[in-house]
């Protein structure tokens, strides 16, 4: 422990008193532990165990008398232990079904070890809904969905009896209610204890689940649950589109003229270490960047709290709608703002949110659509239960009343309560705070702060978006190459080399004109374009309806001047025979100078094409990417301005390709972007022509060029396209890419009505 920290605790005890440090004999059999402030009073000791085991007890706290405070086996109380209970790692087990109506399950055990399965079968005339086989996971929870045997005879479907719960209520018609409780007092019920069959045939509230006190959620489960509510809120743009599908449940439709208020509440109380608070901040930053990458109007509030809340950013500020300002404010949030406050006052931080809402309503007018159409999402990140102030549930009630949250306005408020760590997280309190909606979960407990960061890194999976929102790739760690660049397509015109292209709408592909050099264009109906991953079920072949090649392209145009190949106007369009269904494997990239790209860049509606070029290519060295034949995303640096002039000089020095060239501009016109000056720059291979040259801005991707030609082929002579050779000594590699900013007139001529273009 740091000397200054030890001195702080001595001073806290007052003059003449000595701090009593706690006993260090606190090891756990089969596990480890961490200390928040060494062995001094106030320090928190947290135990951890290998996957599939849990610590008992979970934690201890060093008191001022030098004794350890140890929790009861119950998840709701603590006591001062008269003797030290030996800490051990115990095996995790999953709860057994307490009842299964109209069917059987097997094997029948009191509880189930990690790795075991339980199977469900229905009686005759009943149909199984949910998972027929469920697997006991290392976090103490079953995978899959609750198995239910139903005959469909009632107004609402049989709500089932989830594992570990007991239900009263056998009728499922309109107005009927069912009630749930846990079959053991040691368990904690999350979800709705009471549900009512509604006129729309859906049960009110959310499915109740009983959990062991030591159970927790995996990051992928939480990310999936958040996606259900947030992905479609951010991606849906057509208010008349029917988005209700069985797999996704509820959808929030927000028009481009609508608005989302996002409130991020970060716990900074004493039980949160400064390191974990920094992870809270990083997670919030990831959330902000992801949400601002979608095409909706967003205001973000940031509030840190311990004994009292501190507003870092208010939704009432214009700055709350600027992603840069929001992230700057997040960075400025300091753990030390609350260093003298030891409590966790969740009520006060929620009342601060209520006050913001009240002020905004007063400003906009209670009866105006500007106020009524705002959606509100609250995300509470905490590592413990509220231990001071009024009941947080009362604050939630006031918020719901202010927003008039009733059955027909339930979609206008989502509250996510995320507990981090197993120190003193109160399942009951989290469940009371989280929203209750059919098919969704809003209360979670994660094992640690690192798991929280994983959620925000992997959330908002675009595979669920059904409209043609452009330039969105799946950046999660487990995404495939095609999911990261879903606009990438490949095709092979007859006997020519494979070429690449980019999906720019649901039916049009942009590529290079030289892919069609010396072939019979009337045979285009025989070509096949591979969209999606051609090596998996997600890949599909499309026929070509039409080919449009820039009329100025002629590879032999300057042969008489001693220039064997000339690639000006090296651009073409393919119209597919049918529209591509949007998915995580197939989605268009954003083309600059279009309305879609303008919204993705979050620029004002009055922006111009020149504004886009300035924003995307203003630096003399611009990091960008292209996609290799094997699907890998490779890196280049585009050169502009004076650096472009330096970059193209290598052409005149290459006497093997251009033996008599005296003026570089005869070969490299201002249509071309240049790369290859950096040693770490990748060089495209033959067969990668026509692919997108693109760059990213806040999780959205924009095509600024397409691969055209180069001075060095790193794959020449190699049958393995995964191996790229370095250029031999004396050879200066350079690559040239058609700039989409220079061929705007041609693009507008042929894509008018397909894409909405901005003024030049």
Curated annotation (Swiss-Prot):
Q: Where in the cell is it found?
A: Secreted; Cell surface
Provide one Gene Ontology cellular component: extracellular space
Query: What Pfam families does the record tag this protein with?
Result: Sushi, Trypsin, VWA
Its gene is C2
| Name recorded for this polypeptide | Complement C2
User: EC annotation?
Assistant: 3.4.21.43
Q: Which residues form the Peptidase S1 domain?
A: 471-752
Positions of the catalytic residues = 514, 570, 689
Q: How is it modified after translation?
A: Cleaved and activated by different proteases depending on the complement pathway to generate complement C2a and serine protease complement C2b chains. Cleaved and activated by C1S following activation by the classical complement system. Cleaved and activated by MASP2 following activation by the lectin complement system. Cleaved and activated by GZMK following activation by the GZMK complement system.
Glycosylation sites (chain numbering): 27, 32, 117, 297, 340, 474, 478, 663
User: A GO BP term, please?
Assistant: response to lipopolysaccharide
| Top EC class of this enzyme | hydrolase
The UniProt similarity line reads: Belongs to the peptidase S1 family.
Q: Annotated motif MIDAS-like motif: location in the chain?
A: 267-271
Q: Which cofactor does it need?
A: Mg(2+); Mn(2+)
Which key words are in the record?
Complement pathway, Disulfide bond, Glycoprotein, Hydrolase, Immunity, Innate immunity, Magnesium, Manganese, Metal-binding, Protease, Repeat, Secreted, Serine protease, Signal, Sushi
